Design a protein with these regions (language model features):
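A charged, well-structured terminal subsegment
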Residues: 17-30, 163-168
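C-terminal non-catalytic interaction/assembly regions of soluble proteins
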Residues: 111-214
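Divalent-metal (Mg2+/Mn2+/Ca2+)-assisted nucleotide/phosphate chemistry catalytic cores
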Residues: 1-3
Length: 214
C-alpha cells in the first residue's frame, strides 16, 4: 500500500461509521460511494473497518439479484438496515462481459451520475424500500494524514534521499518486511494492484458476513 492509503481508509471508514447511526434509526438502506474506478482496495478495507454489510468492488462484478437477496436476508433477521460500500468502478456482471466498444456505446446513454445511484434506483424498484446515497468524494483525498502515513512517508523520503546520495537512480522506494528497499521502476511503474477475488482477505470478509454481490 502506498502512502495516503491508510488516511483515505480512515476517512471512508468515518463516513460509513457516521451513516450507521442514521441507517439504524430510520431502518433504511444506505449506499456509501468510495473512490476507486479500477481497483477496490479502498472500498474493501473501509467496508471491513466500517462494518458495511455489502461491499461492491470492480474486481468482483455484482448481480443486483444477489444484492437484493442479501438485503432481504438481513430484513428477515430483523437487522433493520443495510449499508453498502460501493466503489466508483463497481460493475454489474452483464456489463463486465461487454467488449470495450459495447461498454463505451452503453455509457453514452447512461442516465445516472454514478453506479451508486443506479443501484439505489434498482433496489427501490425491486424492494420498495428507501435507499439513500452518500458520496464522500474528494474528502478521501484531503485532510490531515494519519500517523501511519506520516511515518511511512518520512521513511520513504529518507530512503529516497539516501538513494540520491548514493547516485543510485531508476528505483522506487518500497517497504518489504518493514524495511525500505529499492525496486526497479520497470517492476512497478504503471501497474495497478488489483484485488484477487480468491485472496484470503476476501474469504475473511465473507466469513464475517460481508456480501460482494456475486
Amino acid at each position: 500500500m502506498t502512502f495516503g492509503f491508510q488516511s483515505a481508509v480512515d476517512i471512508a471508514t468515518q463516513a460509513i461509521d457516521c451513516i450507521h447511526t442514521t441507517a439504524a434509526s430510520h431502518g433504511r438502506v444506505f449506499i456509501v460511494e468510495v473512490m476507486g474506478h479500477k481497483v477496490g482496495q479502498l472500498t474493501l478495507y473501509a467496508g471491513i473497518a466500517g462494518g458495511a454489510d455489502i461491499s461492491l468492488i470492480p474486481e468482483i462484478p455484482y448481480s443486483i439479484d444477489s444484492i437484493c437477496k442479501a438485503i432481504e436476508a438481513r430484513n428477515k433477521q430483523k437487522k433493520g438496515f443495510t449499508i453498502l460500500a460501493v466503489a466508483e468502478g463497481a460493475i454489474p456482471k452483464e456489463r463486465a462481459e461487454m467488449s470495450k466498444k459495447e461498454l463505451k456505446k452503453f455509457m453514452e446513454t447512461y442516465q445516472y451520475p454514478t453506479v451508486s445511484y443506479e443501484i439505489a434506483a434498482q433496489l427501490t424498484e425491486r424492494l420498495g424500500t428507501e435507499v439513500r446515497v452518500t458520496v464522500p468524494g474528494h474528502t478521501q483525498r484531503g485532510g490531515s494524514p494519519c500517523p501511519y502515513d506520516r511515518v511511512l512517508s518520512t521513511r520513504l523520503g529518507a530512503a529516497a534521499a539516501q538513494a540520491i546520495v548514493d547516485d543510485d537512480y531508476g528505483y522506487m522506494i518500497g517497504i518489504v518486511n518493514n524495511e525500505c528497499v529499492r525496486v526497479p521502476l520497470e517492476e512497478s511503474a504503471g501497474k495497478l494492484k488489483f484485488i484477487d477475488p480468491n485472496s484470503s482477505i476476501i474469504s475473511e470478509a465473507k466469513m464475517i458476513g460481508i456480501s460482494f454481490g456475486d
